[in-house]
Amino acid sequence: MRDRWAVILAGGDGTRLQSMTRTITGDNRPKQFVPVIGGSTLLNQTRRRVALSIESSRTLIVVTQKHQRFYKSLAEEIPRSLLLEQPVNKGTAPAILYSLLRIAAKSPRAVVTLFPSDHFFADDEEFMSHIDVAIDAVEVQPETVMLLGITPTTPETEYGWIEPQPSILASVQKSITRVSKFWEKPSLTLATSLMSRGCLWNSFVMVGCVDALLKMIRAAMPEMYAAFAAIAPAYETANEHKALAELYSQIEDANFSHQVLAVRPEDLMVMRVGDVGWSDLGEPNRVLSTLARLGVQSELAMSAS
């Protein structure tokens, strides 16, 4: 059995939600450090969710240094080796590559699950049961990377969509298929068509063996992979901060969905996830619709009305 590891991506700036999060905190902190729904921050909700299946001692959290005042208490709570501080936010691809290389150095046979830190699930236990199944599937087919796709309830135009190929593995509750292609923020007409033909919302949660994930990134972004691999000897040494700062000053912003997943569908499978009350809280209207679905009265809803 392979070691289970997790990466929580918490380095984004969350600018699209700042007008709303400012109502809660009085400042411009990124949404992952804000109690948008419920009494704890989205990041802490994600940490608790992940801990249902993966040990906290094997969970890396990727942050950005300019947000340090917002994760100060976290830095005091967890071992320093589990908090990966990027010099600046350069997008999801560098954050993921950096974290995977750190894990590979510790546990080269690890199965890694990648989690955004700003999503909401009404049923954490049900969702994490799908993670358990995905991990088991990846152990059987270690060369593949598994995305978790959410069964859509509306023709959402602000989400990414996954178009699956016909099912090759199925059970009564779970369905696993290969990925055909991705659709990013489709028109309403296209989203309606995607929904009618069984396409899925892309949760951006994915599971893979660390070597398979790194192989996929290397194939899609060889120059960036080489740049991060070149400074790997500095990881967890006194030189890491300087090496990262120099590297991040040279690389361009890079989006993992667009520049890795979209160009490597042949490496990917998708697991169909049913109704777990999922929402990507990237836009104010999604927060308000989630609050309405939960029947929650809040200052956010009142201020928007």
Language-model segments: residues:
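Left-handed beta-helix
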Residues: M1-D3, G208-S305
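Conserved N-terminal catalytic core of the sugar/cofactor nucleotidyltransferase
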Residues: M1-G11, R16-T23, D27-P30, P35-D132, ...
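A short acidic, often aromatic-flanked loop/helix-cap motif at beta-alpha or helix-coil junctions
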Residues: T41, N89-P94, T154-E156, S187-T189, ...
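A conserved hydrophobic position in a structured secondary element of the catalytic/binding core
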Residues: V63, F115, P186, G208, ...
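Conserved core of the sugar-phosphate nucleotidyltransferase
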Residues: D124-Y248, L268
